[in-house]
Amino acid sequence: MKSLEEIENILRKHKDELHKRFGVKKIAIFGSYVRGEADELSDVDILVELEGSIGWEIVDLKEYLEEILGIRVDLITKNAALSRKRLWEQIRRDIVYV
């Protein structure tokens, strides 16, 4: 199981590629990894803020993140999170921008 620090380092290393290929302006981790509750079965929850809109490319982005991290990823855009007030409140409590 990777640590939060390892995940942050991998995302930092790939930040330019994420921006170039997918228009990722900001990327953050939230959920069980940030709270220190992750185990071997946990996925990593990732929030992205994008330069523009994204369609089916979100699937490619998710697959790319899973490939570089070696962990199952739950991915949400900031706009999607903001449109669900209760979800956004949960995310805001433990979000860590990379």
Residue ranges of each PLM-predicted region?
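Conserved histidines in hydrophobic membrane contexts and catalytic metal-binding motifs
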Residues: I29
